[in-house]
Design a protein with these regions (language model features):
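Basic, alpha-helical nucleic-acid-binding regions used in initiation and control of genome expression
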Residues: 1-298
Length: 298
């Protein structure tokens, strides 16, 4: 089949700067000169008529909220399949499927709507690049830009518009309501208003995004987090130091993972990896026992 949509690549592929799926869809709608809803409906009609499309078919809601398609679920998987098929581009890293596959569900890990760093948007424009919204900006854990140290915005500082309108008639760097640049910030993100580097509490999540782009989601084994915690438990058990093991996280949570095969929410996994001195990727890939400095396991 010939490509039915412009072959628009996702921005920042292979890096921690990867574009989010909602950003890609909004950007593609603007480049095609149609509203977001029209683009999604058109894409759905095309794959239904295309005998070469082997993916699953889904009925899309009238309106999609960003946080609903940033996890791995039937709807987000469907949109990825459809847009990859129609554009010939790879989009698998544009949503946070790791939240559904490696961690237990929590409604607080992804913010609603879009967020952005005005200084990053301004730099994209200065470099002649098309502005976009990064996947990492959707994580609640990351509230400050790690590059410019300014707080991420969730609404236009001119008029308060949140940029989620399906009437995508302007590029992503322009407010969809007032038409002014969203790269504007009332209080400068630099100098005295910059957030100290030690307050960048979301760096571990940013590193996870980077690691998943580098190694691929397919590199994560099934129940990798369970493997890590079980091996840690066995190590402390052999040394008769279970009390030290339970200092890493609550006893009930750790045993539910080691003995019952349950997972952890992202926030609990962050606490555990921090106390072990390892990355989130090592924890959920089953490598905690081999990388934890405190253990010295050969």
């Amino acid at each position: 089949m010939k490509v039915k949509l412009f072959p628009i690549p996702a921005r920042g592929s292979g890096t921690a700067e990867i574009e989010s799926l909602p950003s890609y869809i909004h950007r593609a709608a603007h480049q095609h000169g149609i509203f977001v809803g029209e683009l999604i409906r058109f894409a759905g009609r095309q794959v239904r008529r295309d005998s070469s499309y082997q993916g699953r078919l889904e009925n899309t809601p009238t309106y999609l909220q960003n946080h609903e398609i940033l996890r791995s679920n039937k709807l987000s998987d469907y949109l990825i399949d459809v847009f990859e098929h129609l554009t010939g581009q790879t989009l698998s890293g544009t949503y946070a499927s790791v939240l559904s596959k490696a961690f237990t569900r929590s409604s607080h890990e992804i913010v609603h709507g879009f967020r952005w760093c005005p200084e990053c948007i301004d730099e994209m424009l200065a470099l002649g690049e098309e502005p976009y919204f990064k996947l990492s900006w959707h994580f609640r854990a990351l509230s400050v830009c790690p590059i410019h140290r300014g707080e991420l915005l969730q609404a236009c500082d001119h008029c308060g518009c949140k940029q989620t309108s399906y009437r995508r008639i302007k590029p992503l760097n322009v407010c969809q309501d007032c038409g002014k640049p969203i790269s504007y910030r009332k209080a400068s993100g630099g100098s005295k208003n910059a957030i100290p580097t030690w307050m960048h509490t979301g760096r571990d999540v940013l590193q996870l995004v980077s690691d998943l782009q580098r190694y691929g989601y397919s590199s994560l084994p099934e129940n990798g987090l369970v493997t890590s915690v079980s091996q840690l438990f066995d190590h402390y058990w052999r040394l008769d130091k279970e009390d030290k093991f339970y200092e890493l996280l609550s006893r009930d949570k750790l045993l539910s993972v080691a003995h019952c095969g349950h997972s952890l929410c992202l926030n609990d996994a962050r606490k555990l990896s921090f106390r072990l001195g390892i990355s989130l990727y090592d924890l959920i890939s089953g490598n905690a026992a081999n990388t934890t400095p405190l253990l010295g396991i050969d």
